[in-house]
């Protein structure tokens, strides 16, 4: 029986069936079919984004994980900062009295940022000494003030500790006489995508770790990392706040010297091509000796570098907030020395108003008003540099050479016990220098110091020859075979020793600015101690950065 031919019904596409279907299960299935059949690119893109997100999440968690730290973490942390010390670059002696009025960035170093690259930041982070907040109540209180979430972190907070506990002093390896006025714990939170950028402030503080070279920067006692939270801690000595101290000692302070020390603090930063970018009277502190120090170095950066909106409202110059994009932080602005000069001029004006509000006459008020007007000029080209500010007639009675060395008077009164504290600090610095010198001597003692051929030095030459053969990959059997022939072995040994000695001398003489030794040679390249110290202090942050960049590449 033959069936009549019937035309096949037209095939419906998944999209048409989806439009007519009302069943949610069928709708979902048809949607998946459409995605699988008609959208292979969409499917692959979706899978790629999913895998990328999971991989990025894994990397961020691994980066933020706190690894265990070796016992000598505090020592390694100090050495890691000593390698790259941009701040250790001393200014020329002829500029000790008044700095030159060079243009901003005229002596710029070839750096994109003040802090190092990712690999070195990670190494510094791992070398931070870990601290458990639950064992020390001061850190527990400090950590409770900040919030560190996975995707975002809040602002840093400070905690004042007038009387540190015995457990805290023991943990910091301090005595009560070392911090007679108390300490400040600054908690710095960070998120999982921080990539170790939170080490910037501890890194910068360690650059200014020697108070004898940088007396106008607040010292740091310890830099720590939490074992249970995404928080870093800076432990600083408790100093007096500038506005409160001016309020208390308004009738006895030396106002001109106060402004001169504030200018000198900024000058020491600008001499090293650094800009603070958030100068205000609240970021200046008064030391126990009655002198000024600058604090809050988290905003420090290379001069003339571009950055998004940073600073305090009312202290920022017009060029950093002249447009909507700048004010909202959508566009970067250039921050340089004249940016700090504007902020410093606003701080001068606030302090002068504060003094007049307390019924105290401002000395040389007319000259100060002219100076502040120039410092706060809306046009950066008309704004003076910090060297020109210090040369203003308002500071005609100030010897900035003494101000730089802090050899003269102090604008505020000394606190009781300030002289004893200064003596203890000097003793601690000398002890640390001796320990560093002993460690360096121990390291140099491991380097072969042979200066003559093996036939004249005996045992020393033999040790050097063995090291040469070991470094060249020679096996013990080959050494035994070589020693069978005395004459030929002695000649080979002597030749190897001479080549090694020459290579060692060339390696010790490497580096810019090295000179040939004069006089008696020593273990550190045959240079007198004074010359070695100059070369060590002259090693800037640029050299360390170049090494780090080479490692990263």
UniProtKB/Swiss-Prot annotation:
Residues 465-486, 494-524, 531-553 have a biased composition (Basic and acidic residues). The keyword rRNA processing does not apply. ATP binds at residue 186. The active site is at 278 (proton acceptor). The record marks 111-112 as: Cleavage. Its EC number is 2.7.11.1. It is found in: Cytoplasmic granule; Secreted; Parasitophorous vacuole lumen. The keyword Nucleotide-binding applies. Gene3D superfamilies: Transferase(Phosphotransferase) domain 1. Pfam families: Pkinase (PF00069). This is Serine/threonine-protein kinase WNG2. It comes from Toxoplasma gondii.
